[in-house]
């Protein structure tokens, strides 16, 4: 650090005057680049000034005039709660009277006067003057305050400060302009400045105003020793302190995470988290996730959000990044922190947990993996009969299940039934009442008769006298099963006979059904006698319809729908399991279009919701299944559900856009969906979501086919154009602008901090403009498009070229550029991370041993059959735009032919927005920047365009009026042209 800025070390330089004198010979106007703080150190022999206590860099607030003086002066770097200290300097190698002045200077590479003022004891006109000596040559500054000048008064204040410095000889050659280094030192009285000197000062003030950072200052100490006449004209070399940051400035305050609503997320990322923090600068902040492994490797990812997702500089809504390995089997602990882009300063990291992906959220796979029933478990005899027979007891004995003494079906007397717990009846949650059983039996008999008549099957009855008992011992066992009353006392009559009669009736029905099935081969014969059991649910709440759909038995579902009892038909077909899923929900989830159609014909209710508030329309939209969605939309009751929001506040159109399904979106639009419906969390429309995902086809479909409101706003007044401009989406900005989006719409986010920029400005009191898309433009290309400049499409690269080897079409110079870019020490953009993204991370140790790891990596990738498309996708995940540009430029140049069409909007002269405006008004709408650098101020985002040339223009823009008069047909034609170019 000493080699970079010796002033910070507090040691002066005797060569300064010589350098000032040399640079004073320059006649170049406004060239302040000659004066830098990078001067060599020296060993002082004569008097010199030294800082012995630096000021505290952070935690001190700059105050405005209306706020009054600060509570306590600027503390020293070593100041503590019970031991205060303040900035101090010492004049070394000298004893006697002296005068020390303190001026505020900038923190950049070049030292200039700062517009802020020092206030407090011994301070006048922004400069502090203190007498030192004659014995104690240590000077302390215990009451220094810093007065913050408003941005609108920077030029005026700075010019006055420069004139004063030149008149009094306070380092004018260093702080103002090298041509003014000849002006006398303090003590010779003020002198009048010439017109040329004033012009130099004015030009210097104009230039330095553009570059000044109002959130940070430094102290410059200059000592003057008396001459032979007693005047303080002998100036010692000045020394400059460490930087002092305004505690209220978002780009200077300490970063701190205050609260997060979630501390864990899925490895696939994309989950929304609300984060509260201390004041941040919305275009200069990142949310960094990182993990360090045992071998010193580093993984990092960044939360996804735009400037519109930062609320009042204190809250950020972002989506988590994907973890480096989405196939983990146990949770992975990482850290999350805030990081400032400009200086890479970070907050204290907080723990975050990535858990494995839950691929079976609807528990379909889990239920499919349950042990399938074995045929031997249901067959009589042995442990199998007892363990899994339909009426088997728990003992597992040979006689505990059904007993078949012979294959003659007349021996029904040999059957006996033992009530016991089995797999079949353990999970029955809904027991049928006696009345229900009786009705079902009657219905069953009628249904059996129907099937008998239909298939012309003769059913012979079995006479009671053909039944015979199986023995005296079994009769004793049956007798032991007599029912007991509440007092556990045996009733007078045993119900063995009644139980046996019921069992015989059941056996007859099943026997007849088995005969019918044997004759017809129609499984419905077997299902018909058990249809009253379709209401029974297992441990998961699933009935037979649920399970048939889960296991993909489409024919069985169809058969069950045909034989189910009429009385409970609707209740059974719309029955919900423990996850509140109906059979129709499961059919949509498992993507069985035929089953969905069968259920709808059978009368399934499309209005029922699952545990998350999702209707079947939501589920089909989320899956992006246009075939199933088409079937559902044809249902007569679907229209009432098409705009319904689920538990997350999303309607079907929002989920379709999130799923990136253009075909489903067209179906919803044709069905009359409200394309301007707002999701209930933040008020985003489908167009907002399409822009967030940078999906041009979806946005175009919404605008052209859905007539979406291009200037629809969220709860905070943000339009889709705000999002496109803030994220730097050039294509979408062009599409929205062509569709008539207004770049001057203000959202509710103030362009500047009311408490800071409006102070001492009565004229603007109460008028705080919001932020427009022009203010949020992330790059100059987007800004020019918003101002009406035609969109110029990049040279297209054919799919054939993308499918070739990654380096085949790159020339040698492009390869070298790519190698160099991948050799960067930045772990997020070097060859090692790229290898991980390309699936070659296992070879990193081998690559590291080669002379050029990046070259070796890409050579291996080429040999393995990798494509340019995959390479660009990996680089996109790394956010390595420079490498992507090198590849695309090389591929485009190799493909360029002489007959290549000029892909610009000029190819559509009748559709050009500028030509249209010119025809109507005779003028072109085109802003020109007068200030290429944005002004940094406390509480103001540096990338936001200045109010002077955006907000004021929006009030007087003729072209904005012209655009508002464009017909819908013209806008659609213009939008189509731009969408065509963005392909």
From Swiss-Prot:
Q: State the residue spans of region: Disordered.
A: 423-454
The record's SUPFAM superfamilies line, in alphabetical order, gives: Ankyrin repeat, DEATH domain, E set domains, p53-like transcription factors
Tell whether Transcription is among the UniProt keywords. Answer: yes
Quaternary structure, per UniProt, is: Active NF-kappa-B is a heterodimer of an about 50 kDa DNA-binding subunit and the weak DNA-binding subunit p65. Two heterodimers might form a labile tetramer.
Phosphoserine-modified residues are: 342, 938
* Region listing for GRR, in residue ranges: 377-397
S-nitrosocysteine-modified residues are 66
CDD domains the UniProt entry points to: Death_NFkB1_p105 (cd08797), IPT_NFkappaB (cd01177), RHD-n_NFkB1 (cd07935)
Where is the short sequence motif Nuclear localization signal located?
A: 365-370
> Under the GO molecular function aspect, what terms does this record hold?
DNA-binding transcription factor activity, RNA polymerase II-specific; NF-kappaB binding; RNA polymerase II cis-regulatory region sequence-specific DNA binding
Encoded by which gene?
NFKB1
Intervals holding ANK repeats? 540-569, 579-608, 612-641, 648-677, 682-712, 716-745, 769-799
About its domains, the entry says:
The C-terminus of p105 might be involved in cytoplasmic retention, inhibition of DNA-binding, and transcription activation. Glycine-rich region (GRR) is a critical element in the generation of p50 (Nuclear factor NF-kappa-B p50 subunit) by acting as a proteasomal 'stop signal', which leads to limited proteasomal degradation of the C-terminus, while generating p50.
Biological process according to GO: signal transduction
Per the UniProt record, one Pfam family is RHD_DNA_bind
Q: Which Gene3D superfamilies match?
A: Ankyrin repeat-containing domain, Death Domain, Fas, Immunoglobulins, Rel homology domain (RHD), DNA-binding domain
Q: What InterPro entries does its record include? A: Ankyrin_rpt, Ankyrin_rpt-contain_sf, DEATH-like_dom_sf, Death_dom, Ig-like_fold, Ig_E-set, IPT_dom, IPT_NFkappaB
Stated name of the protein:
Nuclear factor NF-kappa-B p105 subunit
Indicate the segments forming the RHD domain, all copies. 47-372
Q: Under the cellular component aspect of Gene Ontology, which terms does the record hold?
A: cytoplasm; NF-kappaB p50/p65 complex
This protein's source sits in the domain of life called: Eukaryota
Specify the Death domain's residue ranges. Answer: 804-891
Is Transmembrane helix found in the keyword set?
A: no
Keyword annotations for this protein? Activator, ANK repeat, Cytoplasm, DNA-binding, Nucleus, Phosphoprotein, Repeat, S-nitrosylation, Transcription, Transcription regulation, Ubl conjugation
Task: Give the stretches traversing the membrane.
Answer: none
């Amino acid at each position: 650090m000493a080699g970079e800025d010796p002033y910070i070390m507090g040691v002066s330089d005797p060569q300064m005057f010589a350098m000032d004198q040399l640079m004073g010979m320059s006649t170049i106007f406004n060239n302040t680049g000659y004066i830098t703080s990078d001067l060599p150190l020296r060993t002082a022999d004569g008097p010199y000034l030294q800082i012995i206590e630096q000021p505290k860099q952070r935690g001190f607030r700059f105050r405005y005039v209306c706020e009054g003086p600060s509570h306590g002066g600027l503390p020293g770097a070593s100041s503590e709660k019970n031991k205060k200290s303040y900035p101090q300097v010492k004049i070394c190698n000298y004893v006697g009277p002296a005068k020390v002045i303190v001026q505020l200077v900038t923190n950049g590479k070049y030292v200039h006067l700062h517009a802020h003022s020092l206030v407090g004891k011994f301070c006048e006109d922004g400069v502090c003057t203190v007498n030192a000596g004659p014995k104690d040559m240590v000077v302390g500054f215990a009451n220094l305050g810093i007065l913050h000048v408003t941005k609108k008064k920077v030029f005026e204040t700075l010019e006055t400060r420069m004139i004063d410095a030149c008149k009094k000889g306070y380092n004018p050659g260093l702080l103002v302009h090298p041509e003014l280094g000849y002006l006398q030192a303090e003590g010779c009285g003020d002198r009048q400045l010439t017109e040329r000197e004033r012009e130099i000062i004015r030009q210097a003030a104009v230039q330095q105003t553009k570059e000044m950072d109002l959130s940070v200052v430094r102290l410059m100490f200059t000592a003057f020793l008396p001459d032979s006449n007693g005047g303080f004209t002998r100036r010692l070399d000045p020394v400059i302190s460490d930087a002092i940051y305004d505690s209220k400035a978002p780009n200077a305050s300490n970063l701190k995470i205050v609260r997060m609503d979630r501390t864990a997320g899925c490895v696939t990322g994309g989950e929304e988290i609300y984060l509260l923090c201390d004041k941040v600068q919305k275009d200069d902040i990142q949310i960094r996730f990182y993990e360090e492994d045992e071998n010193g490797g580093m993984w990092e990812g960044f939360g996804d959000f735009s400037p519109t997702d930062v609320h009042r500089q204190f809250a950020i809504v972002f989506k988590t990044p994907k973890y480096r390995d989405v196939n983990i089997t146990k949770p992975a602990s990482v850290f999350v922190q805030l990081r400032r882009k400009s200086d890479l300063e970070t907050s204290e990291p907080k723990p975050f947990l990535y858990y494995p992906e839950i691929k079976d959220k609807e528990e379909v796979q889990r239920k499919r993996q349950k042990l399938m029933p074995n045929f031997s478990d249901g067959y009589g005899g042995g442990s199998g009969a007892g363990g899994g027979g339909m009426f088997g007891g728990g003992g597992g004995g040979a006689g505990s299940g059904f007993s078949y003494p012979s294959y003659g079906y007349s021996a029904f007397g040999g059957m006996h039934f033992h009530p016991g717990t089995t797999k079949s009846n353990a999970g029955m949650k809904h027991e049928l009442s006696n009345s229900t059983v009786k009705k079902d039996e009657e219905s069953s008999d009628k249904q059996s008769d129907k099937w008998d008549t239909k298939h012309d099957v003769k059913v012979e009855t079995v006479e009671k006298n053909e039944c015979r008992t199986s023995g005296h011992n079994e009769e004793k066992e049956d007798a032991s099963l007599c029912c007991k009353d509440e007092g556990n006392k045996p009733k007078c009559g045993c119900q063995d006979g009644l139980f046996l009669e019921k069992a015989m009736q059941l056996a007859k029905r099943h026997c007849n059904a088995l005969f019918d099935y044997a004759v017809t081969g129609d499984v419905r014969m077997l299902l018909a006698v058990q249809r009253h059991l379709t209401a029974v649910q297992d441990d998961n709440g699933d009935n037979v319809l649920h399970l048939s759909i889960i296991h993909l038995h489409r024919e069985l579902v169809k058969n069950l729908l045909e034989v189910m009892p009429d009385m409970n038909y609707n209740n059974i077909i719309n029955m919900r399991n423990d996850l509140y899923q109906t059979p129709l929900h499961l059919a949509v989830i498992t993507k069985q279009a035929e089953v969905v159609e069968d259920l709808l014909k059978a009368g399934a209710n499309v209005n029922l919701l699952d545990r998350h508030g999702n209707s079947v329309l939501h589920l089909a939209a989320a899956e992006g299944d246009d075939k199933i969605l088409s079937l559902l939309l044809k249902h007569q009751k679907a229209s009432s559900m098409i705009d319904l929001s689920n538990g997350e506040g999303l309607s079907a159109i929002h989920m379709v856009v999130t799923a990136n399904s253009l075909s489903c979106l067209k179906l919803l639009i044709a069905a009359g969906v409200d394309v301007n419906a707002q999701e209930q969390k933040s008020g985003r429309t489908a167009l907002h979501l399409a822009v967030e995902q940078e999906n041009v086809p979806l946005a175009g479909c919404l605008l052209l086919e859905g007539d979406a409101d291009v200037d629809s706003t969220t709860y905070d007044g943000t339009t889709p154009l705000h999002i496109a401009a803030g994220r730097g989406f050039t294509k979408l900005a062009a599409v929205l602008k062509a569709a008539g989006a207004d770049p001057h719409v203000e959202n509710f986010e103030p362009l500047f901090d009311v408490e800071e920029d409006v102070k001492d400005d009565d004229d603007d009191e109460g008028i705080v403009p919001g932020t427009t898309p022009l203010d949020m433009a992330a790059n100059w290309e987007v800004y020019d498009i918003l101002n009406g400049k035609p969109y110029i499409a990049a040279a297209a690269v054919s799919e054939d070229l993308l499918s070739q080897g990654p380096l085949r079409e790159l020339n040698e110079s492009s390869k070298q550029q790519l190698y160099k870019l991948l050799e960067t020490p930045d772990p997020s953009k070097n060859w090692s991370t790229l290898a991980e993204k390309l699936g070659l991370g296992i070879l990193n140790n081998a690559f590291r041993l080669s002379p050029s790891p990046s070259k070796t990596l890409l050579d291996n990738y080429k040999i393995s059959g990798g494509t340019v498309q995959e390479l660009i996708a990996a680089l996109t995940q790394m956010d390595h735009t420079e490498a992507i540009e090198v590849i695309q430029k090389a591929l485009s140049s190799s493909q360029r032919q002489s007959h290549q069409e000029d892909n610009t909007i000029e190819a559509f002269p009748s559709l050009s927005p500028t030509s249209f405006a010119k025809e109507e008004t005779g003028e072109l709408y085109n802003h020109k920047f007068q200030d290429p650098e944005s002004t940094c101020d406390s509480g103001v985002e540096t990338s936001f365009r200045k109010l002077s040339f955006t907000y004021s223009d929006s009030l007087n823009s003729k072209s904005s009026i012209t655009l508002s008069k464009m017909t819908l047909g013209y806008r659609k034609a213009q939008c189509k042209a731009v969408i065509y170019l963005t392909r």
